[in-house]
Curated annotation (Swiss-Prot):
Gene (UniProt): ahcY
Annotated CDD domains: SAHH
Record-listed substrate binding positions: T65, D140, E201, K231, D235
Name assigned to this protein: Adenosylhomocysteinase
Subcellular location(s) of the protein: Cytoplasm
Organism expressing this protein natively: Bacteroides thetaiotaomicron (strain ATCC 29148 / DSM 2079 / JCM 5827 / CCUG 10774 / NCTC 10582 / VPI-5482 / E50)
Disulfide bonds: none
Segments passing through the bilayer: none
Reaction equation(s) it catalyzes: S-adenosyl-L-homocysteine + H2O = L-homocysteine + adenosine
Length: 476
C-alpha cells in the first residue's frame, strides 16, 4: 500500500501504486482494451521484431489509465525501457497502475495524490537506474518537460526558485527542485544533454512548447501530437462527446435532459461537449472569445452568450478552454442553488477554485470522492466536481479505448521518429501520410471500406493513388 512505502528524494522503489493486489483486475481490463485499440496492436505486429525503440529510455507523464497501459506495453514491446507517472492527481486508475507495476514497469501513480506526491512521482519517473534521465518523453500537459526546464534554469540561477508564485502546483514544484539542486547541481543539464525529444499529447502542453520555442528557451525537439488530425479531431471531439457525460453522471446521477448546460469554449473539446449535452436533451449555451468559433456554434444552433449572462441561467457549467479564470468567484456567487460546476480542460485554473475555497463564510461538505458541495453565506450552494480538474478522468475513466488508440498510435510513431532521427530544436508535427495511416489502421475494426482512386482520378486532383490525399493546410 502507498502509505507504507518510502518517499526519499531519489527512490530505489521498483514502483509506487495504491494497491498491487489490484493487478489481476487491471490485467483483465487491459486484455479487453487491446481489442478496442487496433492501431497500437498493429504497431506491435509491425515493429515487434525490429524493435525500433531498443535503447530508448522513455519517461511518460500521462494519465495512468487502462488505455495508457496498452500504450506502455506497446512501447515496451518495441524495445523501450519505460518509467511512468500520471499527469493529474485524480486520473490514475489504480488497477491499471498495479497491472503495469506487476509487469515490471516502474510506475509511480495513484488516484488522489497531493501535489507534493505528484511532483515526487514525476521526479521518480524521470530518474532511471544509474542516475540517468530519459532520452525521450511522452508528455501530457507539459509538466515533465517543465520540471526539466525549470530545474535547468535553476542550475544556472537558483533565484528562479525563489520567485513569488501563487499556484500551489508551482510552489510544490519549486520546493522539490530546491531539494534536487541541493543534492545534485548539474542533474538537469545532464538530462537535457541526452534528450532526443518529447511528444506532447494535449493542447495545453503544446501551448507551453510553442511559448518556450518563441522565447528561445526550448532545450530539445518536440512533436506536437495534439494537432495531428487523428488526435485533435477524434480524441478531443469524439472522446469528450462520450466521457463528459460519463463523468457528470457518475458524480451526480443528475438528469441532463431539460437542464441548461453552459459550455465555455467551442474548440474541438467544446464542440464535443456541446453536442453531447444537446444529445441528452439539454439546452446548451456556449461562451466564446473567438469570432470564428462563436459563428460555428451559432450556425450549429447553439445560443452564444457571455458568462455574465449565463451564470444565473445554467444548471451545469463545463469549462473547455485551456485558459485561466473562465468561471470566476463572482460568477459562482450568482449561480442557481446546486448548480454543477466542472472542467474538462487540462489544468484546474479554468475555475477559480482557490477563491472559492477561501471565500468568506464558505462551507464545504464532501459528498463523495471528487464531489464537493460548497455552501455560500446566502444559503445557495454549488457542486464542484473533481476539485476543478478533469471531470472525465476524476469522476469517471476518461475516453473510450478506441478513440485513445488514435492518439496513442500517434504518440508511438512520434517516439519512434524522435528516437531514431536527429531533429533540430523546434516543435514539429507528424507528416500527413502518417496521420492518414493512423486512421487507416482503425477502419477495419468499425467495418469501413475505403474507395480507391483510379490512376486517372489521382492524376486529375494531383495526388498519389495511395495518398496523402489532402494538403497540409486542409481543414478537416
Amino acid at each position: 500500500m502507498i502509505y507504507n512505502m518510502s518517499t526519499e528524494l531519489f527512490s530505489t522503489l521498483p514502483y509506487k501504486v495504491a494497491d498491487i493486489t489490484l493487478a489481476d483486475f487491471g490485467r483483465k481490463e487491459i486484455d479487453l482494451a487491446e481489442k478496442e485499440m487496433p492501431g497500437l496492436m498493429a504497431l506491435r505486429e509491425k515493429y515487434g521484431e525490429s524493435k525500433p525503440l531498443k535503447g530508448a529510455r522513455i519517461m511518460g507523464s500521462l494519465h495512468m489509465t487502462i488505455q495508457t497501459a496498452v500504450l506502455i506495453e506497446t512501447l515496451v514491446a518495441l524495445g523501450a525501457e519505460v518509467r511512468w507517472c500520471s499527469c493529474n492527481i485524480y486520473s490514475t486508475q489504480d488497477h491499471a497502475a498495479a497491472a503495469i507495476a506487476a509487469s515490471g514497469v516502474a510506475v509511480f501513480a495513484w488516484k488522489g495524490e497531493n501535489l507534493a506526491d505528484y511532483w515526487w512521482c514525476t521526479l521518480q519517473a524521470l530518474n532511471f537506474p544509474g542516475g540517468k534521465g530519459p532520452n525521450v518523453i511522452v508528455d501530457d500537459g507539459g509538466d515533465a518537460t517543465m520540471m526539466i526546464h525549470v530545474g535547468y534554469d535553476a542550475e544556472n540561477d537558483a533565484a528562479v526558485l525563489d520567485k513569488e508564485v501563487h499556484a500551489e502546483d508551482e510552489i510544490e514544484l519549486n520546493a522539490i527542485l530546491k531539494k534536487v539542486l541541493a543534492e545534485d547541481k548539474t542533474r538537469w543539464h545532464r538530462v537535457a544533454e541526452e534528450m532526443r525529444g518529447v511528444s506532447e499529447e494535449t493542447t495545453t502542453g503544446v501551448h507551453r512548447l510553442y511559448q518556450m520555442q518563441e522565447e528561445g528557451k526550448l532545450l530539445f525537439p518536440a512533436f506536437n501530437v495534439n494537432d495531428s488530425v487523428t488526435k485533435s479531431k477524434f480524441d478531443n471531439l469524439y472522446g469528450c462527446r462520450e466521457s463528459l457525460a460519463d463523468g457528470i453522471k457518475r458524480a451526480t446521477d443528475v438528469m441532463i435532459a431539460g437542464k441548461v448546460v453552459v459550455v465555455c469554449g467551442y474548440g474541438d473539446v467544446g464542440k464535443g461537449c456541446s453536442h453531447s449535452m444537446r444529445s441528452y436533451g439539454a439546452r446548451v449555451l456556449v461562451t466564446e472569445v473567438d469570432p470564428i468559433c462563436a459563428l460555428q456554434a451559432a450556425m450549429e444552433g447553439f445560443e452564444v452568450v457571455t458568462m455574465e449572462d449565463a451564470c444565473t441561467e445554467g444548471n451545469i457549467f463545463v469549462t473547455t478552454t485551456g485558459n485561466i479564470d473562465i468561471i470566476r468567484i463572482d460568477h459562482m456567487e450568482k449561480m442557481k442553488d446546486q448548480a454543477i460546476v466542472c472542467n474538462i480542460g487540462h489544468f484546474d485554473n479554468e475555475i477559480q477554485v482557490d477563491a472559492l475555497k477561501h471565500y468568506s463564510g464558505i462551507k464545504c461538505v464532501n459528498i463523495k470522492p471528487q464531489v464537493d458541495r460548497y455552501y455560500f453565506p446566502d444559503g445557495h450552494s454549488i457542486l464542484l466536481l473533481a476539485d476543478g480538474r478533469l471531470v472525465n478522468l476524476g469522476c469517471a475513466t476518461g475516453h473510450p479505448s478506441f478513440v485513445m488508440s488514435n492518439s496513442f498510435t500517434n504518440q508511438t510513431l512520434a517516439q519512434i521518429e524522435l528516437f531514431n532521427k536527429k531533429y533540430e530544436v523546434n516543435v514539429y508535427r507528424l507528416p500527413k501520410h502518417l496521420d492518414e495511416e493512423v486512421a487507416r489502421l482503425h477502419l477495419e475494426k468499425i467495418g469501413v471500406k475505403l474507395t480507391k482512386l483510379t490512376p486517372e482520378q489521382a492524376a486529375y486532383i494531383g495526388v498519389s493513388v495511395d495518398g496523402p490525399y489532402k494538403a497540409e493546410h486542409y481543414r478537416y
